[in-house]
Swiss-Prot record:
GO molecular function terms listed in the Swiss-Prot or TrEMBL record: DNA binding; zinc ion binding
Record keywords, A-Z: DNA-binding, Plasmid, Transcription, Transcription regulation
Record protein name field: Putative MucR family transcriptional regulatory protein y4pD
Similarity comment: Belongs to the ros/MucR family.
Recorded superkingdom: Bacteria
Domain-related comment: Lacks the C2H3-type zinc-finger found in all members of this family.
GO biological process: regulation of DNA-templated transcription
Length: 171
């Protein structure tokens, strides 16, 4: 148990000597203030290393709000940080926790293919994109008719989706 403490103290002494040496190479310090500078630098490094250890312990103790296996359903993804349900998790993670999907996966030990969007939501968006003709190569539109055709396609696609929702709701 004393070994890590000695190693940490030794490390702080080395860092103190480096920091003070670098400071003295660019600044003039009276000899009377030198001892105070060394002491303040050492104490600052010690308090920083203690804060880092406390932070690491807090990170290690954190547990997911729900079991990982239950966090993915067809209709929503449950955030492991706070247990809230979302169709798309990416925006919530960045806004509330400042985490990217990759950082979130690393933090919780999730596989690289762990979804950030509920499967039913992704499927609905894919259907809408296909109905709008996205992903297909455009043909040269006739003068004046291209804009009308595009808006007609959008209206037809929206109507098809609305009809599906009505029939799904009635079933």
């Amino acid at each position: 148990m004393n070994q890590p403490r000695l190693a940490s103290g030794q490390r702080n002494l080395e860092l103190t000597s480096r920091v003070v040496s670098a400071y003295l190479s660019r600044n003039i310090v009276p000899a009377a203030d030198l001892a105070s500078l060394i002491q303040q630098t050492y104490l600052s490094l010690c308090s920083t290393s203690q804060a880092d250890k406390a932070e690491e312990a807090a990170v290690e103790e954190q547990r997911p709000a729900v079991p990982i296996k239950k966090s993915v359903t067809a209709d929503f993804i449950i955030c492991l940080e706070d247990g809230k349900k979302f169709k798309s998790l990416k925006r919530h993670l960045m806004a509330k926790y400042g985490l990217t999907p990759q950082q979130y996966r690393e933090k919780w030990g999730l596989p690289a293919d762990y979804p950030m969007v509920a499967s039913s939501y992704a499927q609905k968006r894919s259907e809408l994109a296909r109905a709008l003709g996205l992903g297909k190569k455009r043909t040269a539109p006739e003068l004046g008719s291209g804009l009308v055709n595009h808006s007609q396609k959008m209206t037809e696609a929206a109507m098809q989706i609305a009809e599906k929702k009505v029939w799904a709701h009635r079933s």
